[in-house]
Design a protein with these regions (language model features):
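DNA polymerase processivity clamps
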Residues: 1-99, 114-232
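Specificity-determining recognition surfaces
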Residues: 105-106
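Bateman (tandem CBS) regulatory domains
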Residues: 109-113
Length: 232
């Protein structure tokens, strides 16, 4: 159920776009997937094998209730038909109407090859992003991520008019294929949310340029997180 909560985290609260307030559950190639997005970030989880064709947009509020009631249980039975879905947890069942509509073609946002790939220790990265976030309040949480392949350093920078420039760096493995600087601006809260969802000691940051989607991967292949860059 951890994968459910980590996916539903990025669903939208904007009721004018009801499809984005839900989580898309679907099957493809014999696997069951769950994906959500608010238009600024996206999370995809690979859940389990599925022999049935599934395509349903579930209200994120329903999934939040499922996670709350699940407790220490590791399995939940799911049944859906037409416009309803039911979750069976021991002696409790939760039934909800599905959100009507077609989910966005999100896979086109996920880069298959990237010009820039940075691998860092996840815990160390979280530390310096938290520091940068404190200095980034004037810029609506925007921070600059920059990789230096020569020095093998990843720097996180934020700028304020009162406190000036704050930069922290950590060691990183950096692969650069492009000619442009290995740099991108991201929302610090969105980045911290993603880093806290990923599992494993290391995290990979992959992108194709400062205006391209940023793909973040942990050490487990069942979860992918994407953040759209901040234009600066």
């Amino acid at each position: 159920m951890k994968l459910i909560s980590r996916t539903a985290l990025v669903s939208s609260n904007d009721t004018t776009r009801p499809i984005l307030t839900g989580v898309y559950l679907y099957s493809q190639g014999g696997q069951l997937y769950m994906v959500a997005t608010d238009g600024y970030r996206l999370a995809e989880s690979q859940l389990t094998e599925s022999k049935q064709d599934v395509s349903a947009i579930i209200p994120s509020s329903t999934l939040a209730e499922v996670v709350r009631l699940l407790g220490d249980l590791t399995e939940v039975e799911v049944k859906y038909k037409d416009d309803q879905i039911t979750f069976l947890l021991d002696n409790v069942s939760i039934t909800s109407r599905l959100i009507d509509g077609k989910f966005i073609d999100y896979r086109q946002l996920i880069p298959t090859e990237t010009n820039y790939q940075i691998t860092v220790e996840r815990a160390e990265f979280i530390k310096i992003v938290k520091v940068a976030e404190l200095f980034a309040r004037e810029s609506a949480g925007s921070i600059i991520i920059e990789g230096n392949p020569t020095d093998r350093l990843l720097s996180v920078r934020s700028i304020t008019s009162q406190l000036g420039d704050n930069t922290s760096s950590i060691e990183a493995d950096i692969v650069v294929k492009g000619t442009e600087p290995c740099m991108v601006s991201l929302n610090s809260k969105f980045l911290l949310d993603a880093l806290n969802c990923l599992e494993g000691d290391k995290v990979r940051i992959m992108f194709n340029g400062k205006l391209a989607p940023v793909l973040l991967l942990g050490e487990k292949p069942d979860y992918r997180h994407i953040i759209m860059p901040v234009k600066s």
